[in-house]
């Protein structure tokens, strides 16, 4: 880290302080195409379905993502139900969110971020090991706009982390 350009320290928020280090890295050299591709299809039930053109192998990643989502949605709903019941007993009509619920949302966000990082890191290592120089991902711009697939499917679809 010889080329540190900037350090940013943000004050504590929710008990955590944020430190951002901006540094300069050397631009890696561009490798020429070798005709070996990895295509990635993003979906609802499987986060990523990948196809390796070199050996014809297909693999599916992302079922754990749905499991994480399901667990946290159930836990948040349970805690919210208890919290709202307690608040309505006190006569509070529109209760604020509790610290416990906020902590669960943060925990969910961190778990999803961690899982996506591990998944993409695994894909990068696979590409490096198999000498894949080009990864093709389907065009996902405007994928969520003006889509109506029913109430339940829309909820799942709009909850997917396509912007990451």
Sequence positions of predicted segments:
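An N-terminal domain-cap segment
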Residues: 2-8
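Positively charged, helix-rich recognition surfaces that bind polyanionic ligands
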Residues: 3, 13-164
């Amino acid at each position: 880290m010889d080329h540190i350009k900037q350090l940013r320290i943000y004050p504590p928020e929710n008990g955590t302080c944020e430190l951002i280090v901006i540094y300069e890295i050397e631009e890696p050299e561009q490798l020429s195409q070798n005709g070996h591709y990895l295509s990635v299809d993003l979906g609802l039930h499987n986060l990523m379905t990948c196809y390796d053109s070199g050996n014809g192998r297909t693999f599916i990643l992302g079922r754990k993502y749905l499991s994480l989502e399901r667990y946290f949605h159930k836990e948040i709903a349970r805690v919210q139900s208890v919290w709202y019941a307690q608040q309505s007993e006190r006569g509070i009509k529109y209760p604020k969110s509790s610290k416990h619920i906020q902590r669960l949302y943060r925990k969910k966000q961190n778990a999803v971020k961690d899982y996506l990082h591990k998944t993409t890191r695994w894909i990068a290592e696979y590409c490096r090991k198999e000498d894949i120089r080009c990864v093709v991902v389907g065009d996902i711009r405007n994928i969520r706009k003006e889509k109506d697939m029913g109430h339940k499917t829309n909820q799942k679809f709009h909850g997917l982390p396509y912007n990451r």
